[in-house]
Amino acid sequence: MGAEHYPKANLKWPVVIQNGKRSIEGVTLTLNPNQAYIRCAKPLKLYEVIEMTINVPDLDRSIKARAEVVFSNIHGPDDQISQRGMIVRFLEISSDDRKVIAKEAFEHLKSKEVDSYQLEALQTIILEKGEIEPKAA
């Protein structure tokens, strides 16, 4: 399933990005099982491939992923409408880490007005391990 089918959750988790010898710190603004919008002072260029570690505060664990920059706000304004940062698409991420993101996104979004099809898409990732309770009939 493509990133456009998963809803984006406003989860603000600390991120450390490694790009060769350069290390960049940031924070996720939105996150889903396939991609993340990361706010950082110096976004990378399009198509750069990075190694990243996302710290999941509530679970006291981190997620490691290899990702590609698919959008970068390097030169635009840095304001509430268009915050300085970049969107990365996960190229390599373990299925367990993808499930952690899906579960946290689901928990964050289930009380909001989100298309039920999109919530069900998150559930398909989580249900393999039976980590959420089924919906009441």
What spans do the regions from the language model cover?
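Hydrophobic core residues within well-ordered beta-strands of beta-rich domains
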Residues: L11, I24, I50, I63-A65, ...
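Short, well-ordered loop/turn sites that connect or cap secondary structure elements
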Residues: A9, L44-L46
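N-terminal helix initiation/capping motif
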Residues: M1-P33, A102-A137
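Short, solvent-exposed secondary-structure boundary/capping segments
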Residues: Y37-C40, I74-R89
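Short, charged, solvent-exposed linker or helix-capping segments at domain edges/interfaces
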Residues: Q80, D96-E104
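Short beta-strand-centered aromatic/proline hotspots
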Residues: G26-T28, K64-N73
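Short, conserved beta-turn/loop elements at beta-strand boundaries and strand-helix junctions
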Residues: P33, S72-D78, S95
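Short conserved beta-strand and strand-loop elements enriched in small hydrophobics
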Residues: W13-I17, E48-I63
